[in-house]
């Protein structure tokens, strides 16, 4: 869940079902919920993740969900759409599908944003199944995390960051 304002009983019920190992129940809840709220990217990603089959690849999306919900939702909508398209195209050929991990880096500078993002980046780097990261929302935060990703050989794509210094770091 993004924050208290976005508390969503059906989505939360699905999360509890996932945590309890009740994938079929979660799929039904999320499918029904998305009929009325098709633009909820978090629910869409959860549903997509539940239907992924082996082999699959995992990427993370790290956004300041707590401090910039609207911007984060827009990025997550794009990721959810790309995940849906990619996975659908892999149904018949057995190619690698895509799972998405969502991380909240809360890059609000008044809330030690770069420090939080560095902690998130460090945790993502420890998860060997994660091959890359989409994020972060601001150039300052992307610059603060780039060394962590480089040292751990993680691909990092920052679609909203505009710093030319990031471009200079690209191989």
What kind of region is each of these model predictions?
Residues 111-131:
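Short, well-structured alpha-helical segments in soluble
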Residues 38, 54-56, 74, 95-97, ...:
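Extracytoplasmic
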């Amino acid at each position: 869940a993004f924050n208290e304002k976005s508390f969503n009983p059906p989505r939360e019920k699905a999360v509890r079902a996932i945590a309890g190992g009740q994938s079929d129940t979660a799929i039904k809840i999320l499918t029904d919920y998305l009929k009325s709220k098709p633009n909820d990217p978090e629910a869409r990603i959860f549903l997509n993740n539940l239907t992924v089959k082996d082999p699959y690849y995992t990427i993370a999306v790290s956004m300041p969900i707590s401090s910039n919900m609207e911007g984060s939702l827009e990025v997550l909508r794009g990721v959810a759409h790309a995940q849906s398209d990619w996975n659908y195209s892999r149904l018949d050929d057995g190619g690698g599908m895509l799972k998405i991990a969502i991380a909240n880096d809360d890059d609000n500078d008044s809330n030690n944003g770069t420090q939080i993002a560095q902690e998130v980046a460090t945790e993502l780097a420890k998860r060997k199944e994660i091959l890359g990261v989409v994020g972060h929302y601001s150039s300052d935060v992307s610059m603060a995390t780039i060394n962590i990703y480089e040292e751990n050989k993680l691909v990092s794509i920052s679609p909203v960051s505009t710093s030319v210094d990031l471009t200079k770091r690209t191989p």
